[in-house]
Structure formats: C-alpha cells, structure tokens
Amino acid sequence: MNAAEAAERLLGRQVAATRRLGGGDLSAVFRLTLRGGEALIAKQAANAVAEAAMLRAIGATGAPAPEVLAAEGEWLLMEAIETDGAVGDAWPDLAHMLGRLHAATAPDYGWPTEHDFGPVRIENRPAPDWPLFWAERRLLCHLPFLSPDLGRRIARLADRLADHLPARPAAALLHGDLWGGNVLVAGKRVAALIDPACYHGDREVDVAMLTLFDRPPRFFLESLGLDSGWPERQPIYRLWPLLVHLRLFGDSYANFVETALRAVGF
C-alpha cells in the first residue's frame, strides 16, 4: 500500500497529488494533497501507531504537536504544519513549550511501549530508579553491538551511575529525539514538535540531545531552571544518542562517544 492508498482507505478521501519530502533517514514521509485542496502528511514507519500515541501525549500537555488524523499498521497520517523559520528563531518560545512538556510527569521512568530508531530498539520498560533505567535501557543495551574495549568502558560507567545521576529526578515527559530538525517554527514560535521518541525521565536528557546538534543561546539554557550540576551530567545523557548514531551510521561517531566518556572519567 502506498501513501495515497493508505490515506484514501483510512480517511475515505481521494488524494490528488503525492510528493515525497526530504530527510527521513529512518522512515519515508510524504505530503499529500486531497481532492478538496487540503494538505496532510503521511509517514511510513514500523512504529507508526506508537508514534501517534506520543504525538497525542505531547499535544495533551499544551506543547504543540501535529494533529493525528489516523494511524494504522505502518502509516501515520497527520496535519501538515506550515513553517517559515528554524529553531534559532524560536528559542524563547521553545523554552516555554519545554516547560509545558516536562511538567507532565509520571510515577516511574519509561514508557508503556517499546520504540525504535530503525534497527535500533529503544527499550522503555519502566523502572523505579533513574540510574538503573539509564544503565539498563540506555547504555548496557548497546554492549552486544560495541567493540570489547568500548563495551567494558560503558559497563564501568553504568556500574557507577549512582555517583553521577540523581536517584529520583522528576519523571518528566521527554520528547526523546529533540534536535532542531524536529522543531517546526512559524512566526518565530514553535509550530510543532515532531518525530518524537517519548518516555518519562530526567528533563536534562532533552537538553543534552538539543545541545548535541544545535547551539542554544545562554539565555535559553538559563531560562529552563535546570538543577545544579547539570552540565556535568550532559556527557552521560549524550551517550545515548551518540551510541545510537554509532550503530546506525558507523565509526564517524566513534570520536564523539570517546569524548563523552572521557568527560566523565571513563
């Protein structure tokens, strides 16, 4: 089933035009124009139904997310969001929206369902202890795919996480893959947060991802009101996306992993 066929079956509307959009390393994304002229986005991904639930969870906090029109099998249909800028135009509003997102908390860390970045499985089984969750679900899960030396260093860090991470930070709702490309901007405001990989955890995780690929200004970071010592925890939280990228895209990320490990003494 192609994108147009999926939309026609799920929405009962005829599709007049289909255009594949750029990006989408791990999934295919299309802009569809219906017979009446309305536009929508169709995303083809194995975790389409899970992503729909995440978008709805984000929207329920008051942070902007595309409206889910339908989700079934490998197809997610969403409203089309018009944009006219980039994340650098909307730092003040992004800080405000992250405040809304992260204010939604849960009793435990994790998420009701597993997720994935392409072939990399994201384990989300709930855990009552944050260092335990980060060790088992975000670091040790990579060991079978790493070199023996790198695996040993990751394992040593995992054993010492209680010395580096808070035991019970607020289990905030996280976007989970927060970088500038997943922040849609219009009129210098955040129009939508897209492509989530949600779970509940320390809100500093979203900051670590955002500062990995983007350069937020100082006022943005200060406005978040992060806990004392947050810069020292950032390398530990960056290891998760870096290890995922190492597995997905190869050794070009090895030096970044090394830098993060050395920053925390491993």
Regions found by a protein language model. Name each.
Residues 126-132, 171-173, 180, 184-235, ...:
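Active-site Asp-x-Gly
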Residues 245-266:
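ATP/Mg2+ or Mg2+-diphosphate-binding catalytic cores
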Residues 158-162, 177, 183:
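Anionic-ligand binding region
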Residues 10-34:
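ATP-binding glycine-rich phosphate-binding loop
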Residues 163-172:
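Conserved short strand/loop->alpha-helix "switch" segment adjacent to the catalytic nucleotide/phosphoryl-transfer site
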